[in-house]
Amino acid sequence: MASSSGRVTIQLVDEEAGVGAGRLQLFRGQSYEAIRAACLDSGILFRDPYFPAGPDALGYDQLGPDSEKAKGVKWMRPHEFCAEPKFICEDMSRTDVCQGSLGNCWFLAAAASLTLYPRLLRRVVPPGQDFQHGYAGVFHFQLWQFGRWMDVVVDDRLPVREGKLMFVRSEQRNEFWAPLLEKAYAKLHGSYEVMRGGHMNEAFVDFTGGVGEVLYLRQNSMGLFSALRHALAKESLVGATALSDRGEYRTEEGLVKGHAYSITGTHKVFLGFTKVRLLRLRNPWGCVEWTGAWSDSCPRWDTLPTECRDALLVKKEDGEFWMELRDFLLHFDTVQICSLSPEVLGPSPEGGGWHVHTFQGRWVRGFNSGGSQPNAETFWTNPQFRLTLLEPDEEDDEDEEGPWGGWGAAGARGPARGGRTPKCTVLLSLIQRNRRRLRAKGLTYLTVGFHVFQIPEELLGLWDSPRSHALLPRLLRADRSPLSARRDVTRRCCLRPGHYLVVPSTAHAGDEADFTLRVFSERRHTAVEIDDVISADLQSLQGPYLPLELGLEQLFQELAGEEEELNASQLQALLSIALEPARAHTSTPREIGLRTCEQLLQCFGHGQSLALHHFQQLWGYLLEWQAIFNKFDEDTSGTMNSYELRLALNAAGFHLNNQLTQTLTSRYRDSRLRVDFERFVSCVAHLTCIFCHCSQHLDGGEGVICLTHRQWMEVATFS
């Protein structure tokens, strides 16, 4: 359908202006202060109705209600099995976090690292909580979840077996901030058991709102020590994992394979004239330590100056130890670094700071879950984000360079020295939302990733709205992340200044999941989601007014009789005959059902009936819609692919945003991801009715109408 210069546009306004990503939100709507005040007033200790102390809170499988591990479990408040419980004994330290039997060392290693930074820890564990003054059996913690900080309230009933805490505990037996933090995390995700198995960076991100990277040491370790030193100096949280293909086991040197460790420090010492790079690590189990070179009992410490030795070496079986970098590289496979956001770090003293954009999205089967292969027919339907990098990195003075020797680790490599090409370093982080909570339903993390394409200047104007598959092959791929089944997939990209298209995807077309995409850079950038403005061409709303063929008009009069108007069943009979010629071009009859005919009466008639002049207008619409449908019914099967519904609606004169297109696709496609002619007619008639109604409130029938998101979705979906 040709477009007219006139247009009806729906402008969406935010009814919750001022609610930013940094604003604290109450998980389950529970206010710590309100609950505490109510409990103190009533004299009754808090019992959390949203996370009841019982079998479901423990788990669903190995910790399920009938499991061996769940037998004999009692839920007890600390004062019921501890003489003088304290929330915090003096200061919080990394020795406060000791692992129990849950298998969540990834979480505990991250918590241990967090204790090194009191300012960060105070954000997660708000001060002013204890078991003495104003105790009401309620505590709260603040955790980051997919772009928002959540305040999570818990009661202090903890799972106890044979008089001992089942899960995390403190080395100081009467300290309980760590077990209660673990409970808050379990509540956020549905149960304790869903915390079994994970990656340290996942907890790092949830504790800080930062962005996590995984460094694969077997691929390249050049520049690692410098990267770690600078990461720790910038208050990044750092961990390491020794991978295992047969579960957790202890090596002869005292390391636990398949286990997560915290990296808590770096130091350079001289052994004679040889420079030695040392890393300080901590094992959450506490009692199992490295026994090789530079371990607590290693004689090499005796060769160092007393002042240096006393500053570094603490001989205690607390799970913390030093090891040389070359030994670390022999025994560990990955390093995780979580760089912190400006929201947590505060303004940069140099005035630079970080630039961050966060987007929320969803892959929907049949709409925008197009898979990861750029040459696939559905790849173009994936969500798309336009990234513009405006300023190149600054020059770096670091001598030690490597794959991690750049921004966020060992400083930013820049363009000036040696005439190097200007580069912009940016971190792209793709997060699958809420998949850990879905473990209880048998679901797990999908394999996901993203592509980065460069947009040449001559095509830049074409990427203001979702584009078809015809344009994507014209773009050069600038970078891509690995496909991974982790919650967080992060890639450090080094790109030239310019314009880029970021396309996140699942590995397989049709997989469904919610996601968060974040863009981090120290230099200025802009990022926007590729989306359409909601509008309709005025000509598509006016519709053609075609004279009816004599035979069709006579048939109308015969069916209408003395009433001179058709009801729904009569309209169905008329359309069945009128659309007969179209059946010669398809293997599937183009029938219009009774329910759709009732809808057409609502849109084009008086609600219950249709006069001749109204049918004349409807028939003009149907002929145009049929021509559009035929264009997208390439195999003459009588259906079109639901992934192409957006393009068909564009051809009909309707331009819709991603949210509405997703809603309509889910509503009008069938289980085979196909849209037949009747469903297409119903969808387009639905939109015609909406925009015609809106245009009546505009001068001349065209212009802009402002609606809130809620008002628009209510109008657009008739909800």
From Swiss-Prot:
Domain EF-hand: residue ranges: 620-655
Keyword Ribonucleoprotein annotated: no
Keyword Transmembrane attached: no
Gene3D superfamilies: 2.60.120.380, Cysteine proteinases, EF-hand
Biological process terms in GO annotation: proteolysis
Residue ranges of the region described as Disordered: 393-418
Record region (Domain IV): 541-719
Alphabetical list of CDD domains matching this protein: Calpain_III, CysPc
Function per UniProt: Calcium-regulated non-lysosomal thiol-protease.
Family membership: Belongs to the peptidase C2 family.
PANTHER family recorded: CALPAIN, CALPAIN-12
UniProt-recorded name of the protein: Calpain-12
